[in-house]
């Protein structure tokens, strides 16, 4: 068995699919597996092949999906590529095998387990993105830059950033993914872009949570005074706002 591995980036993922598919045409799809790095438990009898990103190959895969399946199918693949699930890359590969044979109607084939898995990943990533749109808390630095820290399981900060680009187009802000050390940066009246942070940049941005502006205290006061003591329900609250998502929410900080 050949196992193709790559970094958790869209270009690398698409390149990995390209190389694995080319090899599968020679030895068969059943002899190929795909996994995102890092690989925590390697097997002895399998051959591991690392794949680096190649923009030309990645673009060919993207173009083929949109042309031979549909743009909607590419959207599902894109969302699945953001998932933190261990089988996400293999699920994309399995879905494309079905998609290239069925065409545009593949997403209506609900009886196929590979199609259903890609739909599950799409919904999971979409839900997490929606939650963090609600849970993001921005803090002002000198009244010029707004910074929000998140720790999502899936790589959703660009999806979250798309929402705030529509709400705050004329502000300079950034959303930092503390797990992946990346940032979605929005220049004033500009387009969002993704930046991979250096160690120094990340440590500097981590300190931004130590600053409090005039609205931080006001929000904490509002949060604690608007509640009705007789109707407190911490079980329900944890269901709607899980503890692992609260780390950077100022209202839960002492």
Annotate each predicted stretch with a short phrase.
Residues 33-130:
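Charged, alpha-helical interface segments at or near domain boundaries
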Residues 105-195:
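Internal, well-folded beta-alpha domain core
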Residues 12-23, 94-98, 162-166, 217-224:
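Short, hydrophobic/amphipathic alpha-helical patches that form generic packing surfaces
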Residues 48-53, 57, 190-204:
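Acidic, Ser/Thr-rich peripheral helices and adjacent loops at domain boundaries
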Residues 1-54:
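N-terminal ordered "arm"
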Residues 75-80, 178, 231-238:
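Short coil/turn segments at secondary-structure boundaries
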Residues 28-41, 173-181, 196-197:
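A generic structural motif
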Residues 172, 183-184, 188, 203-254:
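Long, compositionally biased intrinsically disordered terminal regions
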């Amino acid at each position: 068995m050949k196992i193709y591995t790559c970094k958790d980036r869209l270009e690398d993922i698409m390149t990995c699919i390209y190389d694995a598919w080319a090899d599968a045409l020679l030895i068969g799809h059943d002899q190929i597996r795909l996994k995102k790095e890092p690989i925590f438990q390697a097997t002895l009898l399998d051959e591991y092949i690392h794949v680096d990103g190649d923009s030309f190959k990645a673009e060919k895969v993207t173009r083929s999906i949109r042309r031979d399946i549909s743009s909607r199918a590419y959207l599902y693949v894109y969302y699945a590529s953001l998932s933190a699930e261990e089988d996400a890359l293999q699920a994309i590969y399995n879905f494309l095998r079905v998609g290239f044979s069925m065409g545009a109607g593949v997403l209506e084939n609900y009886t196929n387990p590979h199609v259903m898995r890609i739909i599950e990943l799409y919904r999971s990533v979409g839900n997490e993105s929606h939650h963090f749109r609600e849970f993001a808390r921005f803090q002002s630095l000198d009244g010029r830059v707004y910074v929000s820290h998140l720790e999502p399981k899936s790589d959703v900060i660009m999806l979250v950033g798309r929402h705030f680009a529509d709400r705050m187009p004329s502000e300079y802000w950034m959303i930092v993914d503390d797990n992946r050390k990346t940032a979605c940066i929005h220049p004033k009246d500009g387009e969002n872009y993704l930046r991979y942070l250096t160690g120094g940049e990340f440590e500097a941005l981590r300190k931004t949570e130590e600053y409090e502006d005039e609205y931080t205290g006001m929000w904490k006061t509002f949060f604690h005074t608007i509640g009705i003591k007789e109707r407190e329900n911490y079980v329900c609250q944890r269901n709607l706002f899980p503890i692992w998502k609260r780390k950077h929410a100022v209202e839960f900080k002492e």
